[in-house]
Amino acid sequence: MKIKKGDLVQVITGKDKGKQGKVIAAFPREDRVLVEGVNRVKKHTKAGPTARGSQAGGIVTTEAPIHVSNVQLVVEKDGNKVVTRVGYRFDDEGNKVRVAKRTGEDI
């Protein structure tokens, strides 16, 4: 998967189109990423005992994972943020590195 934890991404489709956020977690097996402030959902939690005592029930707002095809990487070029696709290349030592397709720079 070309998007990693800690990357700054922009949503390109869906209800949150245009929003930017940092990737909190990546789930490569499901091809999904968790982006802060994007795809917020409300979960109804039941009150019940926990290890530390009682837990109050209620409605909790949290982020839900979105498919990696719905986000694009955002990189900085000349002080501007540019949305780009991600490619790979091998450097001089033979290590595989990510490359921003639009700028041609290593990520």
UniProtKB/Swiss-Prot annotation:
UniProt keywords, alphabetically: Ribonucleoprotein, Ribosomal protein, RNA-binding, rRNA-binding
InterPro entries: KOW, Rib_uL2_dom2, Ribosomal_uL24, Ribosomal_uL24_CS, Ribosomal_uL24_KOW, Translation_prot_SH3-like_sf
Gene Ontology cellular-component annotations: cytosolic large ribosomal subunit
Subunit structure: Part of the 50S ribosomal subunit.
Role played: One of two assembly initiator proteins, it binds directly to the 5'-end of the 23S rRNA, where it nucleates assembly of the 50S subunit. One of the proteins that surrounds the polypeptide exit tunnel on the outside of the subunit.
SUPFAM superfamilies linked: Translation proteins SH3-like domain
Family membership: Belongs to the universal ribosomal protein uL24 family.
Protein name, as recorded: Large ribosomal subunit protein uL24
CDD domains: KOW_RPL26
